[in-house]
């Protein structure tokens, strides 16, 4: 403890300093032991004074040296922070897949296109439909389904170096950031109805569709005409990819059945699940009635979600038997009309998307150069090359002429000297 206290500066230990001050007056008040001690102490005092003087002189010399020799060091010390301030700050690192992003561009990560439907995921189609409906600038990232969000999901977006996952959270965050509220014209009661209906669509009807897909994986590939070679970006033939797809899908079937049972829908029979789906479609049909959209003449968030889910049924190939799709076509024709209206409003490039499987058909492409333009450009280049070659030849001729003149003048001078 004594050594630790000794290392602490005096201003940090006020108790020690006070104790030393209290001892000093006691020492001065004490009388000398005898009179002989005073003369003996005098030389010691003189020596101490001489030593103190030498110390003071030494300290003064040190101070002079410091003033003379250490002033440049102080200047350097002062200049050092200025140099550090002028240095550029390190570049900010973003934990995103697309590091060369443009500011305020929404980068959407989703599944690949199919010939019948822009996306096999109702959640991905929901986000892209909403982005198109509100008019926000976005770009699909062709990642060949390699990436997932930090939550392990698709879709997710990246905006200004930040990741946002889950379709509901994406729409909520973007609505707040850009003030794009599709439900601003709804009453409180209508918003409550919308919220409850969206919950039915996403937490009940979608799971009924997923149950059918998990049970019949072959029908998923055939029903939507999925090209795995294009979707995965692989060169293997589709026959081999389809074979491996069945194996991997068979393994995931057990995981899927566990999820379906945990959800609750998977504990029922196929007939019971089908009836649940028909009841959901009937409720939606009665809500829509004869209106163009669920709450009037303009689409809202409920219309976006309903379109994304019902499209999974409506655009399934007629070659594949699916009772739930047939029920919607026969018993709920107004839902078919709703899907068509949303498609025309949000996806005018639907045919181009499905034929070319283009993720970014909505982004204008640069016009290809015509043959005439290419020929004209080639002629201009050839003319420029000919011009440069002609200039070189002229310069060489001028040099030859100047050399001839110099040689003739030199010969004349030699003759004159002779």
Curated annotation (Swiss-Prot):
Record-linked SUPFAM superfamilies: GST C-terminal domain-like (SSF47616), Thioredoxin-like (SSF52833)
Cellular component terms (Gene Ontology): cytoplasm; plasma membrane
Compositional bias per record (Low complexity), positions renumbered to this chain: 9-19, 28-45
Chain coiled-coil ranges: none
InterPro entries xref list: FAX/IsoI-like, Glutathione-S-Trfase_C_sf, Glutathione_S-Trfase, Metaxin_GST, Mito_Protein_Transport_Metaxin, Thioredoxin-like_fold, Thioredoxin-like_sf
Keyword Methyltransferase: no
Annotated Basic and acidic residues bias: 46-77, 364-418
CDD domains the UniProt entry points to: GST_C_Metaxin (cd03193), GST_N_Metaxin_like (cd03080)
GO biological process: axonogenesis; female germ-line stem cell population maintenance
Start and end residues of each stretch annotated as Disordered: 1-95, 361-418
Keywords: Developmental protein
Disulphide bridges, residue numbers: none
Family in the record: Belongs to the FAX family.
Free-text function comment from the UniProt entry: Together with Abl, involved in embryonic axonal development.
Official protein name in the record: Failed axon connections
Organism: Drosophila melanogaster (Fruit fly)
């Amino acid at each position: 403890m004594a050594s630790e206290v000794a290392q602490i500066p005096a201003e940090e230990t006020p108790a020690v300093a006070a104790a030393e001050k209290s001892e000093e007056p006691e020492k001065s008040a004490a009388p000398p032991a005898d009179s002989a001690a005073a003369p003996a102490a005098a030389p010691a005092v003189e020596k101490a004074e001489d030593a103190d003087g030498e110390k003071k002189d030494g300290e003064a010399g040190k101070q002079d040296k410091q003033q003379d020799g250490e002033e440049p060091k102080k200047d350097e010390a002062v200049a050092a922070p200025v140099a550090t301030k002028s240095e550029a700050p390190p570049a900010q690192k973003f934990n995103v897949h697309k590091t060369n992003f443009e500011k305020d561009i929404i980068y959407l990560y989703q599944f690949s296109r199919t010939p019948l439907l822009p996306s096999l995921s109702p959640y991905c189609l929901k986000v892209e439909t909403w982005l198109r409906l509100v008019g926000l600038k976005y770009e699909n990232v062709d990642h060949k389904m390699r990436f997932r969000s930090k939550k392990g999901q698709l879709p997710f977006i990246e905006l200004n170096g930040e990741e946002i996952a889950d379709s509901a959270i994406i729409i909520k965050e973007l609505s707040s950031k850009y003030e794009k509220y599709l439900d601003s014209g709804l009453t409180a009661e209508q918003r409550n109805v919308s919220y409850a209906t969206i919950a039915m669509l996403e937490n009940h009807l979608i799971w009924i569709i997923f149950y059918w897909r998990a049970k019949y994986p072959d029908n998923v590939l055939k029903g939507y005409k999925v090209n795995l070679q294009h979707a995965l970006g692989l060169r293997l033939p589709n026959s081999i990819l389809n074979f491996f797809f069945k194996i991997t899908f068979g393994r995931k079937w057990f995981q899927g059945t566990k999820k379906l049972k945990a959800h609750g829908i998977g504990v029922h029979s196929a007939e019971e699940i089908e009836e649940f789906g028909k009841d959901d479609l009937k409720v939606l049909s009665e809500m829509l009635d004869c209106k163009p959209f669920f709450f009037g003449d303009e689409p809202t968030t409920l219309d976006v979600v309903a379109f994304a889910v019902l499209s999974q049924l409506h655009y399934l190939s007629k070659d594949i038997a699916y009772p739930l799709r047939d029920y919607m076509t026969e018993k709920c024709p107004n839902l078919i009309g709703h899907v068509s209206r949303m498609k025309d409003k949000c996806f005018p490039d639907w045919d181009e998307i499905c034929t070319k499987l283009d993720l970014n058909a909505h982004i204008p492409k640069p016009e290809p150069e015509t043959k005439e333009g290419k020929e004209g450009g080639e002629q201009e280049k050839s003319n420029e090359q000919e011009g440069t070659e002609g200039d070189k030849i002229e310069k060489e001729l001028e040099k030859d002429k100047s050399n001839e003149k110099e040689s003739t003048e030199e010969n004349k001078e030699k003759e004159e000297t002779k």
